[in-house]
Amino acid sequence: MKGKIVSFILLAFISVTPAYGQTTIKGTIVDSLQVGIPYAAVKVLKMDSTFVKGVAADSIGCFQTSVPQEGKYILIVNSLGYDSKVQIVEANNASSSVITLTPNSIALHDVVVRGSSITRKDTHLQIIPDKQIYKHTNNGYDLLYDLMIPNLQIDRQKGAVTTIGGTVTLYIDGRKVEYREVKGLKSKDILKVEYYDVPTGKYAGDYASINIITRPMTTGGYISVDGTQQLAYQEGDYNLAAKVAHGSTSFTIFGGYNRLHYDADKIEREEFFHFDNNEISRSYSSYEGVNKQNQEYVQLNILTKKKKYMLSEKLSLVRKENPINQTNGILFANTAQTSTAQCSTNTSYSLMPRLSLYGNIDVTDKQYVELSLSGTYGRNKYSNMYKDEKLNTNTIVKEDYYSANFYGKYGIIFPHKNSLSFHLGSVYMNTMSQYMGTYEAWQHQWSSQSYAFVEYVQQFNKWRLRLKPGASALYYHTKDADAVSHYIPQLQSTIFWQPTKSQQVSLDILFSNAYPTSSSLNTAEQIIDDLRIKRGNENLRPMDFYQGTVNYNIQIGSKINITSFSNFVYQHHQYVQTYYEENDKLINSMDDHNNSRGFIEMLSLSWKATDNLRLKIDGVYNHTDVWGKFRTTFNFWRAYMNVNYYCNEFAFRIWANTKGKEMILPMITVEHVPVNYGGSINWNHKDWSFEVGTVSPFHKNNEFIETLNVPVYNSQEHIISSTNRKFYIQAAYTFNFGKKTQKDWKNIDMNVNSAILKAK
C-alpha cells in the first residue's frame, strides 16, 4: 500500500497520465537440466495460427516481446540440437513462461553455436555476457571486468570504472547510479551491457557511459550478505541487502559498514623555497602515524515498473568518520643545521541524508518523458592541527551543505531511427561554513548552473548525424566577493559512419564550460606548516573547453575487438594550482590565468582466445601543454593487460600495468607510478562465492614519487603506503525465497559533498 501511495505521489509530480495499449509475453527457454538455451528462435502466433512476430532469446535463454492485446497465443520455439516445441501461453504483464526443450536424436556432433558477445548497435557497443562469465562472476563489477570491453579500466576492489582521459558514468536500466552501487547487482540478473564510447541521447554530456540492462522479476525476494577482509592491514567491508517484490512494485533495503585502520604513509620529502630575501632548503622524514576511517550507510528503494512507466523513490543516509589521520616526523632545515619534530593531525565527520525521485513515462509509442529530482543535506565537521617546536595551530570547521538537482527530457522518435529531444536541467548548491580557532571566518557560498538543449538525430543510410545546440547559465557568489554570472552557448555534434556491420568511425565535436569546485572557490585558508599555507580563491572565472574526438571500432569475427581512440582538448581559463611568496610564507592557491591543450591516443584489443581464455591489452599516450602564469609540458605512455582463465567452477584472473606518470589538472604535481600487478582465484557454486586475491605481493616498498617545480618552490616526495600491497579474502551468499528475484543494487552515493578548504 505504501509503495502505491508513493508511486501515486510521484505520478502527480510528473503530471502525465500514461496510456495503455500493448502487453508483454516473456519467458525463459531451458533444457532438461533447467539451463538456459541461448539464441533460440521464438515465433508468436494468434490462436487462429496468424503470424504475429518473431524474436530471439538472449545468451541465457530469456526472451520478451510485446503483442497487441492480452489473451492466449501460440509459441513455436526452435533451437539447433533440440526438438521444436509448441506451447500455448497467456499474454499479460505479470506472468513469465518457462519452456523446456528436449534434445533430438539427430543432433549434429561437434557443432557449437556461438553468439557474438560484442556487437555494434547504432551509436553504442552491445555486450551480451556468455555462460562462462555468468558462471564465474558474482556482482556487477566482476561482470564488467570479465567482459573486457575495449578502452575501459575496471577496478573491482575500489569500485571504479574509468577510460583513458575521463571517468565513465554508470546507469542501470537508464537510471544514473554511482560507481560503488553496481557492486550489489548480481551478475546473473544482467541481460546485457550497453557501452556508449561517444555518448548520445540521454547520455550526452558524459565522457563515456555504461547502461546495464537487467531482467525484470515480479515475485519473491532475497537476503544477500557479502564481506571483504584485507589481511595485510586492517580493512573490512561488509554489506547486507533484503528485497521483496510484489507485482510491479519492489522494496529493497541496504545496509553496510566499512572500517579502515592502517599505519600512515612513509614519507621522505626534499624542499627548496626561493624567497626574495631568503633561500631555504629542508628535508622531512616521517617515522610513525596512523589513519582510521569508518563508514556506515542505509538505504531504502521503492521501484514500480509498468508497461508504460517506471517510478523510483530512494532515501539514503551515509555517515563517514575519520577519527584520526596523524603523521609524526622530523624536519631538517638548511642542510640539517637544525631539526624539528612535527605532528600533523586531521579529523573529519560527515552525515548526509539524500532523497531521489525518478520517473520515465511513455506518453505514446513514439513519445516519452523523463524526470529526475534529488536533494541532499550534509552536516560536516573538519579539524586541522599542526604542531612543532615553534608553531601550534588548530582550526575547526563546521559546515551545512545543501544541494538540489533537476533534470527533464521530452523525446520524440521518428521513422528510420531519427529522433528529436528537448533537455532542461538545473544544479543548485548552498553552503555555510564556520571556521574557528587559529583561523576564524564565516563563509557563505551559493551557485547554480541551468542548461537547455535541443538534440536531433538524422540517419542517412550508413551515416548518422547528431546535432545538440543549447545554452547554459552559470552563477556563483561567495560572501564579500563579487557575484559571477556567465551565459554561453554550447554545441555538441557527432558524425557516425558505419561502412560495415563490424566497423564504425565517429567524429565528435564539443564546446562547453564549467565552473570551479566549491572547495576552491572561497576565502578560507589552512596552515600546513610553519612555511606553507593553503588558500582559496573567490575570484575564479568559468572555464571554457573545446574538444574533438575520433573513434574507430572494428570487430574481427566473434573473437577480436579493436578500438582506436584519439582525443584533442583545448581549455581557456584552465584552473591550475599556483604558488607564490607572501610575508616569507609559501601560499598555495588556485589560478585561472592559464590555457591548456592536450592530446590522448589509445589503442585497445580484446581477444576471446577460447571459451576459457580471455585477454585484453590497452596502450595509451598522453601529451599536455599548459601556458600562461604557469608553463609546463607533460608526456607519458602506459600499458595495461588483463588475462582471465576459467576452469570448471574456478576463475583465475591476473592483471598488470607498466610504470608511468600522471598529472591531473588542476594539480601540477607529477606523480611517478610504479609497476602494478595482481591476481585472484574465485570459486562460484550455486548461491555461494569465495575469492582470494593479492595486489603487488612482491613489492613491500612500492614507491610513488611526486615532483613539483615552480619558480618559487621545488619539491620531491617519496611515498610508501602500507596499503599498496594487498592480500584479501571475499565471500558472498544469497538466500532466495519465493520465485527468484532480480538482485537489486546499492543505489547510494557514498561521496559526501563539502565546500570546506582542507589542508590535505
Task: List each model region and its residues.
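Surface-exposed extracellular loop regions of Gram-negative outer-membrane beta-barrel proteins
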Residues: 205-227, 327-329, 372-378, 419-432, ...
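Membrane-proximal, glycine/serine-rich, low-complexity loop/turn segments characteristic
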Residues: 22, 34, 60-62, 83-85, ...
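Outer membrane beta-barrel strand-and-loop segments of large Gram-negative receptors
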Residues: 403-405, 451, 535-537, 541, ...
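A short, solvent-exposed loop/turn motif at the edges and junctions
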Residues: 45-50, 72-87
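Short, acidic Ser/Thr/Gly-rich low-complexity loop/linker segments typical of extracellular
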Residues: 48-62
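Short, ordered, surface-exposed loop/turn motifs in non-cytosolic proteins
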Residues: 33-46, 70
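Outer-membrane beta-barrel translocator domains and adjoining extracellular loop/strand segments
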Residues: 264-279, 323-340, 355, 381-390, ...
